[in-house]
Amino acid sequence: MNSNALSLLGLCRKANKLSMGHDMCKGAVTSAKACVCLVSSDSSERVYDEFSSLCGSKNIPIFRIEPTIDEIHHLIGYKAGIITIDDGGFAKSFMKNFKEYRPGEETLYDK
């Protein structure tokens, strides 16, 4: 994963544009506040499947990212296996720096 994308997560945290942890992320997704959902590499398949169906129903992209829960903790200062970016501008910037970025998806983050 691109280091610029990772550093952007810290910036999102400081700007209070991240939801972190299962319950906060579930609320952000169900209220359609989330623009992108990110699941750590060591989170369970059950969590990924749960959020995959939730995000699919709200047309919110979801990605499994390389950092582990501990690495995310080091980046944002909060131990969470799942996070959402809740700002369209930050989501676009993250996706431009994200290794698996797919052209054309930027229209999904105009919330």
List each model region and its residues.
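N-terminal positively charged helical leader segments and presequences
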Residues: 30, 34-52, 61
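N-terminal first-folded block
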Residues: 4-39
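C-terminal structural segments of small proteins and small subunits
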Residues: 73-110
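Short, flexible, solvent-exposed loop/turn segments with mixed acidic/basic and small polar residues
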Residues: 6, 26-27, 51, 70-75
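Charged, alpha-helix-enriched surfaces in structured cytosolic catalytic cores
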Residues: 4, 46, 67, 89, ...
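Short, ordered loop/turn segments at secondary-structure junctions
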Residues: 23, 42, 67-70, 88
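Conserved catalytic alpha/beta core of Sir2/sirtuin-type deacylases, generalized to analogous enzyme cores
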Residues: 1-3, 15, 103-106
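Mid-chain, well-packed structural core segment of small domains
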Residues: 54-80
